Amino acid sequence: MDARTDKGYRGDAAQFFVAGELCRRQLVAVITLGNCPNTDILVSNAAASRFCHVQVKTFVPGNRTVSVGMKAEKDFGPTFFWVLVGIPIPDSGKDFEFFIVPAADMARAVAESFRLWASSPGAKGQQRDAVNNKVRTLSLPPRTETNGWSLEPYRNAWHRIINAVAT
């Protein structure tokens, strides 16, 4: 029996779905298969004169949050993007969802939301353990983050990557 989880298959599939969407938009998209730190997909224009890096994270449409991890708090620069991919369960009738977020926007929102979470009391009034907590999540639309930030403006915002590699 295969020990891989449904989440593992979904993560692998997401990289191919994102690469396919980028190729449909006449970009070159190469999946790194884990061979490039912080980069799931390397993207270039057809002339290979401009590049950007894409980190892919997955969720199931209808879920409340997507997990992005601590590295989402780091601004990797203007040529780095996060693509959050909602891959529906087969036969669920739900659509795929894509949110294309520049690293600067992601870093600012995740860090601020985590600071707000850490400074608020827990469910039983206790102080939260911000030092040892490595979890970082984002609320999926229609929900917003504690700081009011929403992923909605990033829905299907493929133009952000297209513009980053434009000549």
Residue map of PLM features:
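Mixed-charge (Asp/Glu-Lys/Arg
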Residues: 1-37, 42-167
